[in-house]
């Protein structure tokens, strides 16, 4: 499956795809659709932030991006010194556990490096073992709302 994937950076005029991602993020994490829509529109106009789409057979199946602002920074502003955050890595439910998320992360890293980004951070409570396998280093455990998340970093 992962050998049949294509990857592309989201462009500002891909309104239908932006809307689809906003719907995915609402369904998965209850992030308001309008908030995601506006965020994705704005980052597509900024070379230092981006969103990658994975497609299979021409159909979007996964997405994630590199952002300056992530939810953790609202509760823990001390992490704002780190400018690039991998976030909102999502694979459609029926294709999870097939290596798509790992391949997507690799493609995001390639795009980041090509943009001159040398270090990326993330936070997670559900996929720490995946990120460890992908070479990420655990930095700190942080209480974030009702859960404890692991802040991680990777030099690329």
Positions of the model-derived regions?
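Conserved N-terminal entry element of GNAT/NAT acetyltransferase domains
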Residues: 1-16, 156
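Conserved hydrophobic beta-strand within the GNAT/NAT acetyltransferase core sheet
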Residues: 89, 120-122
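Conserved active-site alpha-helix within GNAT-family acetyltransferase domains
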Residues: 114, 118, 125-148
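Conserved beta-strand in the GNAT
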Residues: 53, 59-75, 85-90
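Short hydrophobic/aromatic beta-strand or adjacent loop that forms the aromatic wall/cage
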Residues: 49, 147-151
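Conserved acetyl-CoA-binding loop-helix of GNAT-fold acetyltransferases
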Residues: 88-91, 97-110, 133
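Active-site rim helix/loop that mediates acceptor-substrate recognition in acyltransferases
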Residues: 26-57
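A conserved beta-turn-beta hairpin within the catalytic core of GNAT-like acetyltransferases
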Residues: 69-86, 96, 115, 145
């Amino acid at each position: 499956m992962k050998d049949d994937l294509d990857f592309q950076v989201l462009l500002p005029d891909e309104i239908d795809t932006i809307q689809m991602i906003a719907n995915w993020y609402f369904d998965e994490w209850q992030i308001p659709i309008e908030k995601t829509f506006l965020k994705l529109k704005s980052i597509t106009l900024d070379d230092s932030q981006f969103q990658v789409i994975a497609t299979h057979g021409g159909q979007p199946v996964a997405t994630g991006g590199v952002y300056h602002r992530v939810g953790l920074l609202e509760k823990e502003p001390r992490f704002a010194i780190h400018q690039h955050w991998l976030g909102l890595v999502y694979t459609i439910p029926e294709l999870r556990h097939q290596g798509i998320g790992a391949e997507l992360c690799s493609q995001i890293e390639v795009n980041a490096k090509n943009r001159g980004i040398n270090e990326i951070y993330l936070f997670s409570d559900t996929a720490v073992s995946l990120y460890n396998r992908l070479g990420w280093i655990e930095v700190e455990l942080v209480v974030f709302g009702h859960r404890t998340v692991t802040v991680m970093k990777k030099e690329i």
